[in-house]
């Protein structure tokens, strides 16, 4: 059999292909079947692939946009609902401290300090801040820090230019003077305050469903003996608002250090309770709680603070301490009153390190 060759040498477009026979080409063996012609599979056109990829990317982008819009709608509706929830409260403005310049106060853009005050007394002229706890929201170290100030601390009341117990500042000039006095004596910038009457405090705890705290046998016996309430001892004892208030106000059992410690335990329990509460339920509770509170925060500021770190703050660790510590003061009688005379330099350094630089180990404080 002769091979056939087709010549492609055309002299013009009208020429036909010239076919040649090759007499020297070897013949295939007779016992081998003729081989099928080999064809390379056709490759799909590249433009179609690109078109499909673009189509998939477009669908993914549309899904992303739809999800983003849904999130915006949810956040916006939550923002409006939260704004409405915190609108019915007692607003009281907080002016700049006129007794000390802001440059003399320690502050940080990553820390928000809110002074919580438990006010004791039915008459405004006789009210004293029986409990003062500075809540420091530390975004840099992802912590919520609670600092109790002992009410018997002997401090300068700047508006009176005289020394007195710390808890007297509120009776002299309300929340404004209480904040000014703390800043003046301790050098820490306080951004906001929230005050609640102790009678209201028990209602707040009830609206949150009570708290679980450790109650020692000594504390339980004292409450059972001196009040009309019955409380058991244990590592996790459930207290309603009335019992929690009695627990916070134990005074004659031990020291003021322990009294403030019990108050911080209840505040910590409230925060932990909030962590386990669904957001929608928490907002509904806030609607009931805020009318019981007096604060300088506007509804917009409260809502902004909640959305600035509200979700992440539920994961923050909680640390607590008090000032002064035992080695930062001398306790004794002063002008017929039991007072704590402070080493202010030591206290200021301690507060700075605890609140701002996170250098203090408070496990044993």
Residue ranges of predicted features:
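Non-catalytic, solvent-exposed segments at the cell envelope interface
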Residues: 2-365
């Amino acid at each position: 059999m002769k091979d056939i060759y087709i010549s492609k040498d055309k002299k013009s477009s009208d020429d036909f292909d010239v076919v040649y026979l090759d007499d020297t080409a070897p013949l295939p063996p007779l016992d081998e079947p003729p081989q099928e012609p080999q064809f390379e599979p056709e490759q799909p056109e590249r433009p179609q692939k690109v078109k499909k990829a673009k189509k998939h990317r477009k669908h993914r982008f549309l899904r992303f946009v739809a999800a983003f819009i849904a999130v915006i709608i949810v956040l916006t509706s939550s923002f409006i609902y939260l704004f409405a929830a915190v609108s019915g409260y007692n607003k009281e403005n907080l002016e700049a401290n006129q007794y000390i310049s802001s440059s003399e106060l320690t502050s940080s853009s990553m820390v928000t300090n809110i002074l919580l005050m438990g006010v004791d007394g039915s008459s405004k002229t006789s009210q004293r801040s029986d409990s003062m706890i500075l809540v420091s929201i530390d975004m840099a170290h992802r912590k919520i820090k609670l600092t109790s100030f002992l009410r018997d601390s002997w401090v300068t009341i700047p508006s009176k230019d005289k020394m007195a117990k710390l808890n007297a500042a509120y009776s002299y000039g309300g929340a404004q003077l209480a904040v000014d006095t703390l800043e003046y004596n301790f050098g820490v910038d306080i951004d906001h305050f929230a005050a609640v009457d102790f009678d209201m405090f028990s209602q707040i705890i009830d609206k949150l469903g009570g708290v679980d705290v450790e109650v020692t046998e000594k504390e339980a016996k004292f409450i059972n003996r001196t009040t009309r309430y019955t409380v058991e001892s244990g590592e996790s004892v459930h207290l309603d608002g009335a019992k929690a208030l009695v627990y916070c106000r134990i005074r004659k059992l031990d020291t003021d250090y322990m009294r403030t410690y019990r108050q911080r335990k209840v505040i910590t329990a409230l925060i932990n309770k909030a962590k386990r509460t669904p957001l929608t339920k928490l907002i509904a509770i806030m609607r009931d709680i805020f009318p019981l509170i007096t604060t300088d925060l506007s509804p917009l500021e409260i809502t902004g603070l909640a959305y600035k770190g509200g979700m992440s703050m539920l994961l923050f660790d909680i640390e607590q301490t008090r000032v002064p510590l035992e080695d930062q003061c001398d306790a004794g009688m002063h002008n017929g009153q039991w007072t704590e005379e402070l080493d202010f330099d030591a206290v200021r350094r301690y507060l700075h390190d605890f609140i701002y630089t996170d250098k203090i180990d408070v496990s044993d404080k």
